[in-house]
Protein backbone atom coordinates (compact mmCIF):
# COMPACT_ATOMS: atom_id res chain seq x y z
CA UNK A 1 0.00 0.00 0.00
CA UNK A 2 1.37 3.38 -0.86
CA UNK A 3 -1.20 6.14 -1.10
CA UNK A 4 -3.97 7.09 1.31
CA UNK A 5 -5.75 9.26 -1.27
CA UNK A 6 -6.35 6.15 -3.40
CA UNK A 7 -7.96 4.19 -0.54
CA UNK A 8 -5.59 1.39 -1.33
CA UNK A 9 -4.54 2.84 -3.72
CA UNK A 10 22.86 21.57 3.55
CA UNK A 11 25.59 20.24 2.09
CA UNK A 12 26.71 16.64 2.04
CA UNK A 13 28.94 17.01 5.08
CA UNK A 14 28.18 14.38 7.67
CA UNK A 15 26.43 12.03 5.26
CA UNK A 16 28.03 8.69 4.33
CA UNK A 17 29.05 8.07 0.71
CA UNK A 18 27.83 11.47 -0.42
CA UNK A 19 30.16 11.57 -3.42
CA UNK A 20 29.69 7.96 -4.46
CA UNK A 21 28.65 8.82 -8.00
CA UNK A 22 30.26 12.21 -8.51
CA UNK A 23 33.74 11.11 -7.42
CA UNK A 24 33.77 8.10 -9.69
CA UNK A 25 32.25 9.67 -12.80
CA UNK A 26 33.36 13.26 -12.38
CA UNK A 27 30.76 14.33 -14.95
CA UNK A 28 28.74 16.98 -13.17
CA UNK A 29 27.56 17.94 -9.73
CA UNK A 30 24.58 15.61 -9.58
CA UNK A 31 23.99 16.14 -5.91
CA UNK A 32 24.42 19.90 -5.85
CA UNK A 33 21.31 21.43 -4.38
CA UNK A 34 20.00 25.00 -4.31
CA UNK A 35 18.90 26.70 -1.14
CA UNK A 36 15.86 28.38 -2.68
CA UNK A 37 13.46 27.44 -5.42
CA UNK A 38 14.51 30.24 -7.75
CA UNK A 39 17.98 28.74 -8.02
CA UNK A 40 16.61 25.68 -9.81
CA UNK A 41 16.66 27.30 -13.23
CA UNK A 42 20.29 26.61 -14.06
CA UNK A 43 20.32 23.07 -12.76
CA UNK A 44 18.18 21.24 -15.34
CA UNK A 45 20.24 22.60 -18.20
CA UNK A 46 23.52 21.61 -16.55
CA UNK A 47 22.15 18.23 -15.61
CA UNK A 48 20.69 17.41 -19.02
CA UNK A 49 23.84 18.64 -20.72
CA UNK A 50 25.77 16.18 -18.61
CA UNK A 51 23.31 13.41 -19.38
CA UNK A 52 23.57 13.97 -23.12
CA UNK A 53 27.31 13.55 -22.83
CA UNK A 54 26.93 10.18 -21.17
CA UNK A 55 26.73 7.44 -23.78
CA UNK A 56 26.66 4.00 -22.24
CA UNK A 57 28.32 2.47 -25.31
CA UNK A 58 31.32 4.78 -25.43
CA UNK A 59 31.77 6.72 -22.20
CA UNK A 60 32.02 3.88 -19.70
CA UNK A 61 35.03 1.62 -19.73
CA UNK A 62 34.43 0.02 -16.35
CA UNK A 63 31.50 -0.25 -14.01
CA UNK A 64 31.03 1.75 -10.83
CA UNK A 65 29.15 -0.18 -8.14
CA UNK A 66 26.59 1.44 -5.89
CA UNK A 67 26.77 0.73 -2.19
CA UNK A 68 23.51 -1.24 -2.36
CA UNK A 69 21.39 -2.84 -5.06
CA UNK A 70 18.16 -1.02 -5.94
CA UNK A 71 14.93 -2.00 -7.69
CA UNK A 72 12.64 0.02 -9.95
CA UNK A 73 8.92 -0.54 -9.41
CA UNK A 74 5.90 0.65 -11.38
CA UNK A 75 2.33 0.92 -10.09
CA UNK A 76 -0.25 0.71 -12.87
CA UNK A 77 -3.46 2.76 -12.74
CA UNK A 78 -6.41 0.95 -11.12
CA UNK A 79 -7.99 -1.74 -13.28
CA UNK A 80 -11.33 -3.36 -12.55
CA UNK A 81 -10.93 -6.84 -11.13
CA UNK A 82 -7.31 -6.40 -10.05
CA UNK A 83 -6.09 -6.03 -6.49
CA UNK A 84 -3.64 -3.28 -5.61
CA UNK A 85 -0.83 -5.82 -5.24
CA UNK A 86 -1.53 -7.03 -8.78
CA UNK A 87 -0.99 -3.52 -10.13
CA UNK A 88 2.46 -3.20 -8.53
CA UNK A 89 5.13 -4.47 -10.89
CA UNK A 90 8.79 -5.14 -10.14
CA UNK A 91 10.59 -3.88 -13.24
CA UNK A 92 14.34 -4.36 -12.84
CA UNK A 93 17.16 -4.23 -10.29
CA UNK A 94 20.53 -2.56 -10.71
CA UNK A 95 23.75 -2.27 -8.72
CA UNK A 96 26.02 -0.04 -10.79
CA UNK A 97 25.92 3.56 -11.95
CA UNK A 98 25.97 2.44 -15.57
CA UNK A 99 23.01 0.11 -15.13
CA UNK A 100 21.01 2.92 -13.54
CA UNK A 101 21.63 5.37 -16.39
CA UNK A 102 20.78 2.70 -18.95
CA UNK A 103 17.43 2.11 -17.25
CA UNK A 104 16.58 5.74 -16.51
CA UNK A 105 17.27 6.87 -20.06
CA UNK A 106 15.09 4.08 -21.48
CA UNK A 107 11.90 4.30 -19.41
CA UNK A 108 9.19 6.93 -19.83
CA UNK A 109 9.60 10.20 -17.97
CA UNK A 110 7.62 10.59 -14.76
CA UNK A 111 5.66 13.47 -16.29
CA UNK A 112 4.40 11.12 -19.02
CA UNK A 113 2.88 8.59 -16.64
CA UNK A 114 -0.92 8.31 -16.49
CA UNK A 115 -2.80 9.51 -13.43
CA UNK A 116 -2.85 7.16 -10.44
CA UNK A 117 0.43 5.52 -11.40
CA UNK A 118 3.73 5.56 -9.52
CA UNK A 119 7.45 5.12 -10.03
CA UNK A 120 9.41 3.81 -7.06
CA UNK A 121 13.08 3.08 -6.43
CA UNK A 122 13.62 0.92 -3.35
CA UNK A 123 16.47 -1.04 -1.85
CA UNK A 124 16.39 -4.53 -3.34
CA UNK A 125 14.21 -6.84 -1.30
CA UNK A 126 11.91 -4.08 -0.05
CA UNK A 127 8.53 -3.59 -1.70
CA UNK A 128 7.06 -0.05 -1.93
CA UNK A 129 4.20 -1.03 0.35
CA UNK A 130 3.23 0.03 3.85
CA UNK A 131 2.95 -3.64 4.85
CA UNK A 132 6.52 -4.56 3.94
CA UNK A 133 8.39 -5.49 7.16
CA UNK A 134 11.02 -2.83 6.42
CA UNK A 135 8.35 -0.13 6.01
CA UNK A 136 5.56 -1.04 8.41
CA UNK A 137 7.05 0.90 11.35
CA UNK A 138 8.10 3.85 9.22
CA UNK A 139 6.65 6.73 7.29
CA UNK A 140 7.41 9.24 4.57
CA UNK A 141 8.39 12.81 3.91
CA UNK A 142 6.28 14.12 1.02
CA UNK A 143 6.37 17.15 -1.25
CA UNK A 144 3.29 17.86 -3.36
CA UNK A 145 2.94 20.28 -6.26
CA UNK A 146 0.73 20.97 -9.25
CA UNK A 147 2.00 19.20 -12.33
CA UNK A 148 1.35 21.94 -14.87
CA UNK A 149 4.38 24.10 -15.58
CA UNK A 150 6.63 22.22 -13.17
CA UNK A 151 10.05 20.70 -13.72
CA UNK A 152 8.96 17.36 -12.30
CA UNK A 153 11.30 15.20 -14.35
CA UNK A 154 14.41 17.02 -13.18
CA UNK A 155 13.27 17.03 -9.56
CA UNK A 156 12.50 13.32 -9.68
CA UNK A 157 15.92 12.62 -11.14
CA UNK A 158 17.59 14.63 -8.35
CA UNK A 159 15.65 12.62 -5.78
CA UNK A 160 16.53 9.26 -7.30
CA UNK A 161 20.20 10.18 -7.52
CA UNK A 162 20.22 11.27 -3.89
CA UNK A 163 18.61 7.97 -2.91
CA UNK A 164 20.90 5.59 -4.81
CA UNK A 165 23.90 7.78 -3.99
CA UNK A 166 22.80 7.47 -0.33
CA UNK A 167 23.03 11.16 0.53
CA UNK A 168 19.58 11.52 2.09
CA UNK A 169 20.21 9.80 5.40
CA UNK A 170 22.93 10.74 7.93
CA UNK A 171 22.71 7.29 9.55
CA UNK A 172 22.76 5.26 6.35
CA UNK A 173 20.04 3.03 7.80
CA UNK A 174 16.71 4.85 7.63
CA UNK A 175 15.81 5.47 3.98
CA UNK A 176 14.20 2.51 2.20
CA UNK A 177 13.20 4.19 -1.05
CA UNK A 178 11.69 7.10 -2.95
CA UNK A 179 8.34 7.36 -4.72
CA UNK A 180 6.81 9.59 -7.39
CA UNK A 181 2.98 9.59 -7.38
CA UNK A 182 1.24 10.95 -10.47
CA UNK A 183 -2.28 12.12 -9.67
CA UNK A 184 -4.90 14.16 -11.47
CA UNK A 185 -3.78 17.78 -11.26
CA UNK A 186 -0.74 17.22 -9.07
CA UNK A 187 2.27 15.03 -8.33
CA UNK A 188 3.92 13.96 -5.13
CA UNK A 189 7.56 13.03 -4.45
CA UNK A 190 8.28 11.16 -1.23
CA UNK A 191 11.14 9.54 0.65
CA UNK A 192 10.26 6.55 2.83
CA UNK A 193 11.90 5.71 6.15
CA UNK A 194 12.08 2.52 8.25
CA UNK A 195 11.06 4.18 11.50
CA UNK A 196 8.87 7.11 12.41
CA UNK A 197 9.90 7.92 15.98
CA UNK A 198 13.44 9.34 15.85
CA UNK A 199 12.57 12.98 15.30
CA UNK A 200 16.18 14.18 15.15
CA UNK A 201 17.08 11.79 12.33
CA UNK A 202 13.80 12.39 10.53
CA UNK A 203 14.33 16.14 10.66
CA UNK A 204 17.79 15.79 9.12
CA UNK A 205 16.37 13.61 6.36
CA UNK A 206 13.57 16.12 5.81
CA UNK A 207 15.98 19.04 5.55
CA UNK A 208 18.12 17.12 3.09
CA UNK A 209 14.97 16.21 1.14
CA UNK A 210 14.11 19.90 0.80
CA UNK A 211 17.66 20.72 -0.19
CA UNK A 212 17.77 18.11 -2.96
CA UNK A 213 14.51 19.39 -4.45
CA UNK A 214 15.42 23.04 -3.97
CA UNK A 215 12.28 23.70 -1.95
CA UNK A 216 12.11 27.25 -0.63
CA UNK A 217 11.31 28.18 2.95
CA UNK A 218 7.87 29.28 1.77
CA UNK A 219 7.01 25.71 0.77
CA UNK A 220 6.32 22.90 3.21
CA UNK A 221 6.98 19.19 3.29
CA UNK A 222 5.06 16.89 5.62
CA UNK A 223 5.89 13.66 7.41
CA UNK A 224 3.24 11.01 8.02
CA UNK A 225 3.49 7.50 9.48
CA UNK A 226 2.43 4.54 7.34
CA UNK A 227 0.39 3.27 10.28
CA UNK A 228 -1.63 6.49 10.27
CA UNK A 229 -2.03 6.32 6.50
CA UNK A 230 -3.38 2.77 6.63
CA UNK A 231 -5.93 3.76 9.26
CA UNK A 232 -6.95 6.91 7.39
CA UNK A 233 -8.18 4.99 4.35
CA UNK A 234 -9.35 7.47 1.73
CA UNK A 235 -8.85 10.36 4.14
CA UNK A 236 -5.57 12.20 4.46
CA UNK A 237 -3.30 10.85 7.19
CA UNK A 238 -2.42 13.19 10.02
CA UNK A 239 0.87 15.06 9.78
CA UNK A 240 3.41 14.19 12.46
CA UNK A 241 6.07 16.69 11.38
CA UNK A 242 6.41 19.51 8.88
CA UNK A 243 9.34 21.57 7.63
Curated annotation (Swiss-Prot):
GO terms for cellular component: cytosol; eukaryotic translation initiation factor 4F complex. InterPro entries: TIF_eIF4e-like (IPR023398), TIF_eIF_4E (IPR001040), TIF_eIF_4E_CS (IPR019770). Belongs to the eukaryotic initiation factor 4E family. The keyword RNA-binding applies. This is Eukaryotic translation initiation factor 4E-2. Keywords: Initiation factor, Protein biosynthesis, RNA-binding, Translation regulation. It comes from Schizosaccharomyces pombe (strain 972 / ATCC 24843). The keyword Protein biosynthesis applies. SUPFAM superfamilies: eIF4e-like (SSF55418). The gene is tif452. GO terms for biological process: cytoplasmic translational initiation; nuclear-transcribed mRNA catabolic process, nonsense-mediated decay; regulation of translation; translational initiation. GO terms for molecular function: RNA 7-methylguanosine cap binding; translation initiation factor activity. Recognizes and binds the 7-methylguanosine-containing mRNA cap during an early step in the initiation of protein synthesis and facilitates ribosome binding by inducing the unwinding of the mRNAs secondary structures. eIF4F is a multi-subunit complex, the composition of which varies with external and internal environmental conditions. It is composed of at least eIF4A, eIF4E and eIF4G. eIF4E is also known to interact with other partners.
Amino acid sequence: MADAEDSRHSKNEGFPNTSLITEKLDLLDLFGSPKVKTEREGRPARLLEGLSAVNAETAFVKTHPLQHEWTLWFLKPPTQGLEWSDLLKEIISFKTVEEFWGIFKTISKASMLPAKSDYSYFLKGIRPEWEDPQNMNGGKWAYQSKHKGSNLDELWLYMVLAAIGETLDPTGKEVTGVVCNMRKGFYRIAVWTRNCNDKDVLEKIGLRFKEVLGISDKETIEYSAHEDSSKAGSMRAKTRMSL
